[in-house]
Amino acid sequence: MSVLNIAVSRCSPTVAFCSLVILCILFKVLTRVREDRKIRSLGKYGHQIQSKLPLGIGFLYSMVKAVRAQKNFEFWRDNIFGASGRWTVETRIMNERTIFTADPGNIKAMLATQFSDYGKGAAFHAMWKDFLGNSIFATDGERWSASRKLIRPQFTRDRLSDLQCFEAHMQTLFRVLDAGGSPLDSKHAEETPMSQGKAIDIRDLLYRFTFDVSTDFLLGQDVQSLTTPRQEFAHAFDEVQRMQTIFVRSRHFSKFMSKKSFRDSLKVMNGFIHKHVRRALSLSPQETQQKSQSGSKYTFLEAIAGFTRDPTMLRDQIVGVLLAGRDTTAATLSWALYELSRHPEAVDALRREILQTVGSDAPTYDQLKNMPYLKAVLNETLRIYPAVPYNVRIALEDTTLPHGGGPDGSEPIAVLKNTKIAYSTLILHRRRDLYPATSEKFADPAIFSPDRWLHWHPSAHDYIPFSAGPRLCTGQQFALMEMSYVLCRLFQRFERVESHMQHIDGGNPTLKADIILSPGDGVWVSFHEPKQIDSNQLL
C-alpha cells in the first residue's frame, strides 16, 4: 500500500474535509495572484464597485431587484456609475470579474477599432443556442461572417424601395383602428377620460403590425396577428422570447427552472418556420433566381435559400432577423408616438412636412428619404430610447480598453480573456456631458426635441442606436424605412394624437428592458382626424 493511501485511510472525515477546503482556498488564492499579475502587466484595474455581501451577492441582489421593478436604468445610472462619477467601473460577481462602461471610447474599441478582441463568446452562444441557433446575433468569427454575407445583400435599395408590403399591412392597421383597436383594460378603465376620444394601446397594435410585416417579408406569409391576436405562431414566438429572457437573467440558476413552456413553444415556432424552409428548398437555386427576375413576390427566405441549402442555417437566420425586425421597430414606433402625443408642436411640424412633400397619396421611397423632420423625429426617439439599451461583449483574448484604469480612470483598463464587459447605449445617449450646453438652439438633452437634429449632429460613437463597426445592424435602412412609412401614413390621416399616459405613469415612462427597450405600461393614445381638410394643404 502506498504512503498516500495509508495517509488517506488514516484521515478522519473531518480532517479530509478541512484539507479539501484548504486546497480549494489555496487554488483560488493562487488563481487570483496569477490573474492580478496578468492584469498589472496589461494595464490597470478600474474603479471597484463595493458589495455589501461577499462574492458580489449584495450587488447581484440589488441588480435583480431593480430589474424586477423595471428600474434597470436607475440602477445603472445611480448604483453603477453615479456613486463613483466614473463611466467605466468593475466588480466581481460570484468571483467573476465584470466591467461596466458607458464610455464612448471604450464602446468604440469593442465595436470597431479592437473588434477582433471582443465578441459574443461561447457562453452567450450556448445560452441562446436553442432560440437563436447560429444566427448573426449569437455567433463570432467565421460563423458570424458567413451569416452576415448571407443576409446583407437582402437589404439593398432595390429591396427597400418596394413599399407594397408596408402599404398592405398599413391598410389593415387602419381597419383595426377604425374598429376601435384594443379596448382599454379594466386596470386603467377608470383612470382614462374616455370622453377625450377612444383610447387604445398603440404599442400592442404596433407589435402585431411589425410581426405581420416581418413574416410577410421573410416568409411570404402574413400571419395576420393584427386581426388574430392569439395567432399560434406569434404567441409561441413571444413565449420563447419571454422564457429566454428569464433564463438569461437567472444565469446559473436557470438549470433548476422548468423549461416545459419554453420547449413546447419552441416546437410550435420551429414547426412553423421549417414548413416554410421546406417550401423554399423545394425550389432549385435556378428556379429561385428566375422567380426573382420574373417580378414574382420577393421573400427573404427564398432569396437566401439560393445561397445555402442547409435548413438549420436558414431557420436560424429567419429567427434572428424576425426578432430584430419585429421588436426593435415596434418599440421605436411606440416610443415615437409616446413622445409625439405629448408634443403637439412636433406633430404639427411633422404633419406639415408630410402633406407638403407627399400630399394624400402613398409615399415613395425617395419622398420618405427626403423629409428631414421625419428623420429628426426618429433620430430623437432613438437617442432617448435606443432599441437595445444594454449589451454585453466577452474578451476573446487578453486585451485592454482605452479608458477607465488607474486612480483617475484616464489609463487603459486591463481585460483578460473571457472577462465580461457590459455596456449601456441608454446611459451613453443620456450623458449630459456629451451634449452642447442648453441654449435657445439646443434644448435640454433630457427633453424630446426633434428640432435639435436640424442643426446638430452627434459624434460618431456618442450615438449608436444601430450599434457600430462591423456589427452595424444590416437591417438599419429597412427598419428606418418601415418606421418612416408608418408615421407618414398615420399623420397623413390624423392631425392629432392625444396622450392618456398622464393618468397611468404620471408622465414618467416605465423603461421596460427585456432584450428590447419598450414602454412598460403600453402607449395609450387616441387619434383625431381633421374636422375639415383644407384642399390647399394637399397641393
Curated annotation (Swiss-Prot):
Q: Which family does it belong to?
A: Belongs to the cytochrome P450 family.
Locate the transmembrane regions by residue number: 15-31
Cited function: Cytochrome P450 monooxygenase; part of the gene cluster that mediates the biosynthesis of varicidin A, an antifungal natural product containing a cis-octahydrodecalin core. The PKS module of pvhA together with the enoylreductase pvhC catalyze the formation of the polyketide unit which is then conjugated to L-isoleucine by the condensation domain of the NRPS module. Activity of the Dieckmann cyclase domain (RED) of pvhA results in release of an acyclic tetramate. The cytochrome P450 monooxygenase pvhE then catalyzes the oxidation of the C21 methyl group to a to carboxylate group.
Q: How does it sit in the membrane?
A: Single-pass membrane protein
PANTHER family, per this entry?
A: P450, PUTATIVE (EUROFUNG)-RELATED
Descriptive protein name: Cytochrome P450 monooxygenase pvhE
Q: What does the record give as its pathway? A: Secondary metabolite biosynthesis
Going by the UniProt annotation, this protein carries glycans at 379
Q: Which residues bind heme?
A: 473
For this protein, the record's InterPro entries field holds: Cyt_P450, Cyt_P450_E_CYP52_fungi, Cyt_P450_E_grp-I, Cyt_P450_sf
Localized where?
Answer: Membrane
Source species, please?
Answer: Talaromyces variabilis
Which EC numbers characterise this protein's activity in its record? Answer: 1.-.-.-
